Amino acid sequence: MGAMIVREVFEIAEKIKNMEIRGAGEIARAVAEALKIQAEKSKAKTSHELWKELKEASKILYNTRPTAVSLPNALRYVMYRGKIAYTSNADLESLRYTIINAAKEFIYNSEKAIERIGEIGAKRIEDGDVIMTHCHSKAAISVMKTAFDQGKDIKVIVTETRPRWQGKITAKELASYGIPVIYIVDGAARHYMKMTDKVVMGADSITANGAVINQIGTALIALTAKEHRVWVMIAAETYKFHPETMLGQLVEIEMRDPTEVVPKEELETWPKNIEVLNPAFDVTPPEYIDVIITEKGVIPPYAAIDILKEEFGWAFKYREPWED
């Protein structure tokens, strides 16, 4: 008999897949929550059955979005703690408690991290700064909002972020805090870089050499900023750092549906020899980045490897906890 997976796990997996739940932090908290619900609602009679269900649930969640490293890192955080309990012969209720607790702890820490990044990053923002941002990053917004709440006079240039327009979400959110916003098309980033003092963006993943994987368009903005000698700050929680890259694995860049770029009805009328490509992310090399702001402090990109060793060093002694 197969493992009994609760409905909520499938619902959360589906929402991550179709981007109803989006943004690395939101995705990470959602998968931790899914494991918590699986543990709470499980009808398992033994710790062996519950562990089997948790592994199955983890696999379902793991396969939803290939690039967002926050997703496997959240699963690792919860499941490694579960694995230690399970392999030390924990009984059913102890294992359940371990998983629920680890999930709550992960969610709490990840919310606190955003606040802390705001406090640390705001120190780098000066009164009168014009800041450019791209896509929608809770960590980047936290830096700008904290600086504004400290009474610094800032203005933010927001790129629309095609094809899914995450810039609209960012622009409205910043404006709701009272921050003056300029909203521009992605192609205008270089034109407005001359009036920009700092670039503050988030990250989906950060590799061992300090390269940043983020929403498509991030690398172009960072390149333009470097050309104009404008400071580039990446705001990211430590669970965005990608442990597998220490072992030389390359990050897979997710390709999304062409109909996000050209509506289906229109695409069907196009000549067949036009191929529409829609990569979700690009890679910004570390030399285009001045600092990475984490909840543990400000680091230069080349120190990413130190964060990885500190946070995930243990991960290399084992296989993934949901693998057999």
UniProtKB/Swiss-Prot annotation:
Its EC number is 5.3.1.29. Disulfide bonds: none annotated. It catalyses: alpha-D-ribose 1,5-bisphosphate = D-ribulose 1,5-bisphosphate. Keywords: Carbohydrate metabolism, Isomerase. It comes from the Archaea. InterPro entries: IF-2B-related (IPR000649), IF_2B-like_C (IPR042529), Initiation_fac_2B_a/b/d (IPR011559), M1Pi_N (IPR027363), NagB/RpiA_transferase-like (IPR037171), R15Pi (IPR005250). Coiled coil: none annotated. It holds the Pfam family IF-2B. Substrate binds at residues 22-25, 65, 137-139, 240. The active site is at 135 (proton acceptor), 204 (proton donor). GO terms for molecular function: ribose 1,5-bisphosphate isomerase activity; S-methyl-5-thioribose-1-phosphate isomerase activity. One of its GO terms (biological process) is pentose catabolic process. Reaction proceeds via a cis-phosphoenolate intermediate. Catalyzes the isomerization of ribose 1,5-bisphosphate (R15P) to ribulose 1,5-bisphosphate (RuBP), the CO(2) acceptor and substrate for RubisCO. Functions in an archaeal AMP degradation pathway, together with AMP phosphorylase and RubisCO. Belongs to the eIF-2B alpha/beta/delta subunits family. R15P isomerase subfamily. This is Ribose 1,5-bisphosphate isomerase.
